Amino acid sequence: MNKKPLILGIESSCDETAASLITENEQGIPVVLSNIISSQVEVHKEFGGVVPELAARSHMEKIDLIVQKAIIESGRKVEEIDAVASTAGPGLIVCLSVGLSFGKAFAYALNKPFIAVNHLEAHALSPKINLELNYPYLLLLISGGQDRKSVV
């Protein structure tokens, strides 16, 4: 029996700090073991939109706790993590830098690979978490200031 990889994913592209642990089942279907999200809606509400500097500061304040909670909720140990992935873009650069720096440092500390993830490509492939996809499929993606119509 092959060991299934355990990946720590980190998201900080805009106004949510998130961490998740994911693996796969025997059929190769992704299995989400934990998914912790901290929203910044209240932080930005009075400004009528996301303030990048405030968003980045909020990420810095919360990212360690969010990752810890994700690991605990997954029921796995930090030593079992095989790789760390973080959103690399598109997104707000000051926010992305928080997740990327944390993810790279975490991977380095564990002596594990680091994976930079394209935010839009991840959205495009996220249906695989709950569905068996038949390629090609039509994708309409609207995320923040980005939109795409594609055949995947």
Q: Where are these predicted regions, by residue range?
A:
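Short acidic/glycine-rich loops and adjacent helix/strand connectors
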Residues: 1-152
